[in-house]
């Protein structure tokens, strides 16, 4: 007759077997990949520069990271539903390209980290406590410096020495209002009067340009964030029609037919946003990640447009450009 095993031997054996099975199951199950909620003002997908930035850091969409993309299609009234949807999905990190959306997220969640790629005034709008120590769940990049408006006015003055009245065609919201306010100081120093004009909807643009010409503006500063190429082209065409030298701050403005553009290199901003995502995924807190100012500015000139409005760009200005679209049939 065999001696009976103590009961504890069987219990231990079962426990060991259960542990081994659990380990095998866990090994077979794919590790949870982080979800990035991405809300854009417009567009059909995340910025390619952002995707490249992630790849540089070892993240491949669908393999070790997932991006849940939503677009407002240029309609700010859609932010509330899209913000609620992404928060409801419990994404790990939120990325957005504008201040209004970031503020909407901040109202709904204080726990999901938010990375903003292009904030004009993160402190003034209440997104963060300070540039050095944001202090909440928002961090990221600002796309503007306080001197941007003044720099654009200086460029306009160089190509139009008799510049006296400049219209600022802009969007709504506190960031745009701050831009106008910060530009007033250098405008006074240059003896330029500013005329602030809210762009409104696409159907209002013709009337806005009539108002600008009625105000006798002889220069135009275009501050329209989030416009796609078709809408930018519409604005550029109207500026050409009214023979207004127009400098924009948006990427794609010169390609759309605008005379000149000066502003942060948006592609660099998006690649840097990927760095913020990486840091957050590795355990850093948004409250401790400083807001980053633009690292690179782009100055572009369209000589075709200059010719259309009868303007000659001085060589001293051309030499400083990072990109020049030459006249058609130019041999240079």
Regions found by a protein language model. Give the residues of each.
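Short hydrophobic alpha-helices and adjacent helix-cap/hinge residues
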Residues: 1-332
């Amino acid at each position: 007759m065999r001696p009976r095993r103590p009961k504890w031997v069987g219990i231990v054996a079962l426990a060991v077997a259960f542990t081994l099975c659990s380990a095998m199951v866990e090994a077979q199950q794919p590790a949870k990949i982080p979800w990035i909620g991405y809300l854009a003002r417009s567009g059909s997908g995340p910025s390619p520069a952002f995707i490249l930035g992630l790849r540089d850091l070892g993240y491949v969409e669908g393999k070790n990271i997932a991006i849940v993309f939503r677009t407002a299609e240029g309609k700010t009234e859609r932010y509330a539903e899209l913000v609620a949807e992404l928060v409801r999905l419990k994404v790990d990190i939120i990325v957005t390209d504008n201040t209004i959306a970031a503020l909407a997220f901040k109202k709904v969640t204080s726990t999901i980290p938010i990375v903003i790629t292009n904030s004009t005034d993160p402190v003034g709008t209440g997104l963060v406590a300070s540039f050095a120590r944001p202090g909440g769940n928002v961090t990221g990049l600002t796309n503007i410096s306080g001197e941007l408006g003044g720099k654009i006015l200086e460029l306009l003055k160089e190509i139009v020495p008799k510049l006296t009245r400049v219209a600022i065609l802009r969007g709504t919201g506190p960031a745009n209002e701050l831009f106008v306010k910060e530009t007033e100081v250098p405008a006074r120093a240059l003896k330029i009067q500013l005329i602030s004009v809210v762009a409104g909807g696409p159907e209002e643009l013709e009337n806005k340009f009539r108002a600008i010409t009625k105000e006798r503006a002889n220069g135009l500063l275009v501050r329209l964030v989030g416009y796609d190429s078709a809408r930018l082209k519409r604005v550029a065409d109207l500026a050409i029609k009214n023979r207004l030298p127009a400098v924009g701050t948006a990427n794609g403005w010169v390609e759309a037919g605008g005379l000149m553009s000066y502003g942060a290199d948006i592609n660099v901003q998006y690649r840097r946003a990927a760095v913020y995502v990486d840091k957050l995924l590795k355990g850093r807190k948004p409250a401790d990640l400083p807001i980053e100012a633009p690292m690179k500015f782009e100055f572009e000139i369209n000589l075709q447009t200059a010719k259309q409005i009868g303007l000659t760009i001085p060589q001293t200005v051309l030499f400083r450009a990072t990109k020049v679209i030459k006249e058609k049939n130019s041999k240079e």
